[in-house]
Amino acid sequence: MTDRYILAVESSCDETSVAILKNDNVLLTNIIASQVESHKRFGGVVPEVASRHHVEVITTCFDDALKEAQLEASDLTAVAVTYGPGLVGALLVGLAAAKAFAWANDLPLIPVNHMAGHLMAAREQGELEYPLMALLVSGGHTELVYVTEPGEYHIVGETRDDAVGEAYDKVGRVMGLPYPAGREIDQLAHQGTDTYHFPRAMMKEDHLEFSFSGLKSAFINLHHNAQQKGEELVLEDLCASFQAAVLDILLAKTKKALKQYPSKMLVVAGGVAANQGLRERLAEEITDIAVVIPPLRLCGDNAGMIALAAVVEYEKGHVAGLDLNAKPSLAFDSFHQQ
């Protein structure tokens, strides 16, 4: 059998990435050019800055990926690209590069949903069993997705306001922690105790919706009031208390989803899936079903996950024309509707 090589491009936010996947799940290379240092001084991602950085490095990422994989463009089978959701300017840079490369080398173009990429990153560890439940947690999304078969995604629950990663970054900013704050809050939480009481919105309700705005506001109010009164708060305990509330909500809703939807495994993916506290709670509390979490190198935004998702789309015959456009608000239920 002839080997299949898919080159994938990811540029939906602040990471420029090009990867090459061999056959079903062998990542030959996963080049990532991060912009985190450029955005730190702003306390978050600045869309215009992100787009400019993508333009500066994307050609080099293509060259480095082919060189590291020891392949020529003529060896490739297809090109995959994230077309949404994400920042429109950032998406357009990756799309333009992928379409130009596909056209120049007469290769089919595979459109990939960024969140499907996060979910399908779990494929690197082996074939997934369906139906499965997925908890997707990142800076822009918090979703429970029921996957009935490869490529068939159904959102069964999502946040009504802030995404969990967004909440981490906002409370981190209040505490004066550098962006992105998730990793540092996780580390500090392991050094503290759950001392301060924070609300756990809708945790006991049967539906699968999330809400983190109340928790975020309660945290900000506690911190502000303490400053006004000259009271000293213990940073480690603040982080431990905040993270305990977040994880209580995530675990409660995930358990409800598993009861409501027959599933053979649970996939937890997205940038927040790198959180050590979340991984520990999952291992402790969900023991009657296989829990699959991508390795740390595939939790953040990267083209490797886009390539892993592209295999499913390619095998279903989902290819796009060169008129494929960015869809910054793309949802799973609008997937394939180019």
From Swiss-Prot:
PANTHER family: TRNA N6-ADENOSINE THREONYLCARBAMOYLTRANSFERASE, TRNA N6-ADENOSINE THREONYLCARBAMOYLTRANSFERASE, MITOCHONDRIAL. Belongs to the KAE1 / TsaD family. Substrate binds at L136, V137, S138, G139, G140, D169, G182, D186, N275. InterPro entries: ATPase_NBD, Gcp-like_dom, KAE1/TsaD, TsaD. Binds 1 Fe(2+) ion per subunit. This is tRNA N6-adenosine threonylcarbamoyltransferase. It catalyses: L-threonylcarbamoyladenylate + adenosine(37) in tRNA = N(6)-L-threonylcarbamoyladenosine(37) in tRNA + AMP + H(+). SUPFAM superfamilies: Actin-like ATPase domain. Its EC number is 2.3.1.234. GO terms for molecular function: iron ion binding; N(6)-L-threonylcarbamoyladenine synthase activity. GO terms for biological process: tRNA threonylcarbamoyladenosine modification. Keywords: Acyltransferase, Cytoplasm, Iron, Metal-binding, Transferase, tRNA processing. GO terms for cellular component: cytoplasm.
